[in-house]
Amino acid sequence: MSVSPVRCEPVVDVEEPVEAEVLVSSQRLSFLGGVDPKTGEVVDPSHELCGEKLTGRVLVLPGGRGSTVGSYVLMEMADRGTAPAGIVVREAEPILVVGCVLGDIPLFHRPERDLVEELSTGDVVKLLPGGKVEV
């Protein structure tokens, strides 16, 4: 694993570094029906992260999917304190962008290296201002 920062494009940037454990998935995730906003747990039985809690972790995956209501699920998670510490995706789509903006959840996309392939669940990363991920 590299120790050099990976450059991404910040969609919702961090003001201060955020250090947290990573939760990695090779699948896109729908927040509506796929995540319980009360607990922060992935509840979609067809998703490889089913049973995992997103709370306080940096979620690394290809992107989001699903209903526009997913934006409000992310906002509710932020309000309840069950949101991820940050999200890093290959490509951010509008549902994810709106949810992260509303919930003030750090969102980085278009990493210069494929972090879905490079990182493993349990690794610790640091999100740095300007869209850098220290791995």
UniProtKB/Swiss-Prot annotation:
Q: In the UniProt record, does the keyword Membrane occur?
A: no
Active site per the UniProt annotation: S67 (proton acceptor)
Q: Which reaction does it catalyse?
A: (R)-5-phosphomevalonate = (2E)-3-methyl-5-phosphooxypent-2-enoate + H2O
Instruction: Return the broad EC class.
Output: lyase
Q: Which GO terms describe its molecular function?
A: hydro-lyase activity
The pathway is: Isoprenoid biosynthesis; isopentenyl diphosphate biosynthesis via mevalonate pathway
> What Enzyme Commission number(s) apply to this enzyme?
4.2.1.182
Q: What's an example Gene Ontology biological process for this entry?
A: isopentenyl diphosphate biosynthetic process, mevalonate pathway
Q: Does the keyword Translocase apply?
A: no
Which of UniProt's keywords are assigned here? Answer: Isoprene biosynthesis, Lyase
* Record's function text: Component of a hydro-lyase that catalyzes the dehydration of mevalonate 5-phosphate (MVA5P) to form trans-anhydromevalonate 5-phosphate (tAHMP). Involved in the archaeal mevalonate (MVA) pathway, which provides fundamental precursors for isoprenoid biosynthesis, such as isopentenyl diphosphate (IPP) and dimethylallyl diphosphate (DMAPP).
The family this protein is said to belong to = Belongs to the AcnX type II small subunit family.
The record's note on quaternary structure and interaction partners says: Heterodimer composed of a large subunit (PMDh-L) and a small subunit (PMDh-S).
What is the official name of this protein in its record? Answer: Phosphomevalonate dehydratase small subunit
| Organism from which the protein derives | Methanopyrus kandleri (strain AV19 / DSM 6324 / JCM 9639 / NBRC 100938)
